[in-house]
Amino acid sequence: MGARAFSHDSIFIPDGGAESEQTVQAMSQDNILGKVKTLQRQLGKNIKFGQRPSNAIPMKKAGSTDASSEEDFVLTSPMEIVTQQDIVPSDTENKSSDTPSSSSPLNLPEAGSDMEEKVAPVKPSRPKRHLSSAGTIESVNLDAIPLAIARLDNSAARHKLAVKPKNQRVSRKHRWLAQDRQNEPGSFESQSSLDQNGQLGEDKHIWHGEEPEPLESHEEKRLHEEYWRELEAKCKRQKAEAAEKRRQEEQRRQALERRLWEESLRQELLEEEEEGEEEEEVKEEGEEGEEVGLQPRAGKVPPEEGHQSGPEEQRCTEQELGGADDPARLEAEERRREQEEAERQAEKLRQREAERQEEEQKQREAERQEEEARQCEAERQAEKLRQREAERQEEEARQREAERQAEKLRQREAERQEEELRQREEAERQEKLRQRDAESQEEELRQREAERQRAQEEDAKGMLQEEEEEAKRIEELKGKETPEPLVEEGPQSPEGESQPWLTDDADQRSPLQRDLEKPGEREREDLESAGQREIAEEPRGEGEPAEQSGDLDAHCGGVDGEGKETAQTDSPQPQERQMEGTPAPEENEATAADIDRKVEELRWQEVDERQTMPRPYTFQVSSGSRQILFPKVNLSPVTPAKDASLAPAAQEPPAPRGAASHALPSALSIPHTAILVTGAQLCGPAVNLSQIKDTACKSLLGLSEEKRPMDVPTVESRAGSGKSRPAPESPSNAAALAEWASIRSRILKNSEGDQRGDREPARAGDEPVPRARCDSRGNVRRTPPVNAKFSIMPAWQKFSDSGAETFRQSLDGESGRKKPGLAPSEETAPQPHAAAQQEVSQEPPDTTDGCKFAKDLPSFLVPGLPSPQKAASRTESTTTLDSETTSDVGNPDPAMPGGEEKASPFGIKLRRTNYSLRFHCDQQAEQKKKKRHSSTGDSVGGATPATGSVSGESEPEATFLKHGPSLPQERKPALSPRKDSAESHSSGHYVAVAQSGLPPASGQTPAPEQDRAVSKMPSMQKPALAPKPASQTPPSSPLSKLSRPHLVELLARRAGKLDSEPSETAKESSDNQPPSPSLPEELKGQKRDEKDVPEKKPASPPLPAGQQERPSLIPETGRKEKPVLQSRHSLDGSKVTEKVETAQPLWITLALQKQKGFREQQATREERKQAREAKQAEKLSKETVSVSLQPGSSRASKTAPVHKPAAPSEEKKPETAVSRLQRREQLKKSNTLPTSVTVEISDSAPSAALVKDVTKRFSTPDAAPVSTEPAWLALAKRKAKAWSDCPQIIK
């Protein structure tokens, strides 16, 4: 309203009417083109504005506002909007000069053709509609305009009133037909004029209310009429032109409609859906058209009424205009409606088509995407399929490959199994062949033994007289040297043993046979031999080193002249046998004792057979508790050897020895496979005995006639071990023992290196070591064989017995004999001891050779040459009671395999390396064995003291040495000995009784076992002899030898006596019988003993001290070597002891505590044992006197040491008790030690220290343990450090 009312066209200043008109026209002409402009210019000169009917403006306002508002709400399609635009600009053409593009008529002619493209002008039109709809005077901003309004001229108002009706009609037509007339120039003139008039009308209306319209003059009316006429003429022309244009436009529209209808036909479906909407739109548009038509009609009336001056003219003009306009307008409206409808439909079609196309495009896009997705999915699926196929093929290929591999493996496995079967079959065939060979050899041996026995019987008859004489001498000697007879007995066996082995075995077996046949004769013979040994050993005790060397040399020579020695030994033994036969009372006693012993041996043999049934032993080789080197090592005892040996042993004592040796041949291998130093390998059968050609080896192994002597020599070697006593045996016996030692050492060496080439030199070199070893070994061997189920041996000794295969065979011969009974074990020990002692005196350095340290497993010592092994064992045993113990233990271990150890494999445990061999045996059997050994130790200990009352001190000392050196062995027995107050005695007794008891169990072997036990007893008595050796350490080794053979005889007799006398020995021997079943426990006991050995070894070292005094020459060298061994092999008792004690403070403390109790027990037990031993010692001393007389110089040398040891033996007895206590402590330690812990052998170092303490111990046996404890405690502490370092070292 404001925009129209106050547009420049409608404002006139009254003073300058024409000027204002011109100004207004000029302003409006900017937007007016063509004819309209010219018409306005022309009219502007003539038109005088006068008042128009006031109704015109309201009608106009109402029409324009209502129409615009209706159109705002009703118009929906683009065509309608365009129409609205065309209409509104026609009304507001002059007013909206600001928007020429929308209001300018120039744009309108193109609306028909470009209908679709003129949607944009809607926006300018709507603001105009808004203004028009809002048009009220109040809403107009009149701040600056009221002055102009006040100055408006009447002519302008009149002109407006005059022009308004037509203007309104034209504008209404234009509203209806704007689209039809868009391109018609005539319409623009009418529009512009109508707009002007309309605006003027509006303006006039405004001031019409303000002031009354003055009446126009006549002239003005005339001019006005002229103006209207001209205007009408112009309008007609314009209408004609517009009609023409409309026709043209209508044609175009029809063509467009045809096209649109054609499109609509194509989209009938869409049209049908939207017909309802279209019809509604058509109705709405019809209504709009009607309303629009009403508005022009309504607008007509007021102007007609408004004409006051010229109604007729106006009517004419209106009629003309109406006549001209109505048909055209109606046509135009009809065409417009049709066109609009067509356009709307075409637009809808286009929209629908566009939507359809867009939808189709979307669908196509979606389909394309879906197709792509499907393709991708298909590709993925195909890829997956390909992958799965490839995987399947690969899997099939893998399966095929796996099947091929499995097939290959199966084939290889089948081939391997076939190969194994073939190998097993071959091995079985070979084993059968070996067994047949062994059986044939055993048969030969049995025949030879029978011949020997017959010869021995003849000799015995001849010897009865000599024995009677010797019995007298023995009786005289008994009071002086009880241990000497023991030693002599041992020597006799060793003598016969070492001489021709056959002769020695014959001698020993003849004593055993005599025991079986003529116990009295045998006893006399044993007494004579013992007496001779004692006599020879006493001198030896003083000049032991030289005597030993001589003996060793003699033995070497004896080895060379084995037959000679055999003859010599045979002759002395027959004499002894005659002497034995002479003393009827003693012979009767011996016979009774032999009978009892045989009975018990049979029992023991049965027990041993049961226990030694080939029970495979499994043990672990472990480094510490964490690293297990070999989780399960199986040691399977050789049943044939054991059975053969046990069966023959059961048959007769002499035969048993032969049987034992035979059993070994039948076994063709060591009773138990030996663990090599590597620990990884298990030795198979040492050698086929049938393959042994060397007579010495055969004699050692009992493969030849000497095999029987071998068995006896084993005992005799023990007798030799106590060479001081073997002196009574006579040089022949000494030579035989030396020969034995050299042969054995050589065998060991040969098995290690030049088995036979080195024998002679080895003999010579090793014999000194053997003496030293024998001391320790004799001691160690004595005890451990009984208990040792599992013996810890120096590698050299172990291998000397079991490590060196040749020596092992010899040991096997021995241990074969020993297998029948524990005595064989001890036999093995004594022989090595005898040989070792001789070798020690002769060749201490060989000890070093004997112990070769395995580099791969430092815990195991590789056996050196046989002699070096013995020498090493000697040296180690002498130098280190520990190593001695180890060696002894080693021998006993093999011996035990022979006897009790049949059930128990022998292994080496070295504390330093922390490698342990765990032997798993029946706990019950072990416990039984332990009980036996403990009881046996007591009875044997008692017997030993009784026998060694004279040699009691030396015997306890020797026993201590035994316990020290043989602590490994004694550790086992010593365990019981510890329990037994007198440990050395208990160990000695234990060994002796166990052996004597076991000999009964083993029947024939029992005799050798008894001899061995006797030899062990002499070893215990050997301390008695050892006292001299204490001054001379080597003598103690002879003492151990003498005491062993002597103890063997003593135990043989004592076994009878113990069986007859105190049944305690029998009980103990029966206990020993259990020990064989309880070998595992014995081994445990032995381990304990061995563990205690460090403690006891200090005590035993005093004996070594005594021994060292004698063997000091050799033992010192041996000791020097022993320390090397200790450092090298950690076998040295000192280092081992250190390790044991230091490594295990707990067990050390426990061992110390146990030592106290054991010392007390030992004191009481030793008292009892000494009482028993005193009696036996008297008998043995008498026998020893006679025997020592017979043995000749060699026996004299042996006997001299024996006699000397007799006194020291008493001293040593207290020390033996001390040593027993110490040993027990060590055994306790060993007991406290973990079973898997490597058992230390710790005598050698303590022996050196003990040498210093020996005098103290001798003087104060009870105090000796105290002095010993510090030494071994220090060693133990050092060992503890070593132990702590062991795992790292091992790694």
From Swiss-Prot:
Its main location: cytoplasm. Residues 159-176 have a biased composition (Basic residues). Residues 270-291 have a biased composition (Acidic residues). Residues 184-199, 1183-1197, 1229-1238 have a biased composition (Polar residues). Pfam families: DUF4592. Residues 201-221, 302-318, 326-461, 470-483, 506-527, 534-543, 594-612, 749-778, 969-983, 1056-1070, 1081-1098, 1117-1141, 1157-1182 have a biased composition (Basic and acidic residues). Disruption phenotype: Knockout mice display adenoma development in the small intestine in an age-dependent manner. They also develop pulmonary lesions resembling early small cell lung cancer and solid-pseudopapillary neoplasm of the pancreas. Tumors from mutant animals show increased expression of Wnt/beta-catenin target genes without the alteration of other signaling pathways. Intestinal tumors exhibit disorganized and decreased levels of F-actin. The modification Phosphoserine is found at S7, S28, S132, S493, S510, S636, S867, S1037, S1076. GO terms for cellular component: cytosol. The modification Phosphothreonine is found at T482, T639, T1033. Expressed in the small intestine (at protein level). It is found in: Cytoplasm, Cytosol. The keyword Transcription regulation does not apply. Residues 48-71, 84-137, 159-221, 234-253, 267-663, 701-1238 are annotated as: Disordered. GO terms for biological process: epithelial structure maintenance; maintenance of gastrointestinal epithelium; negative regulation of barbed-end actin filament capping; positive regulation of actin filament polymerization. Residues 580-593, 875-888 have a biased composition (Low complexity). Directly interacts with actin-capping proteins CAPZA1, CAPZA2 and CAPZB; this interaction decreases the binding of capping proteins to actin. Involved in epithelial cell integrity by acting on the dynamics of the actin cytoskeleton. Positively regulates the actin polymerization, by inhibiting the interaction of actin-capping proteins with actin. This is Capping protein-inhibiting regulator of actin dynamics. It comes from Mus musculus. The lineage of its organism: Eukaryota, Metazoa, Chordata, Craniata, Vertebrata.
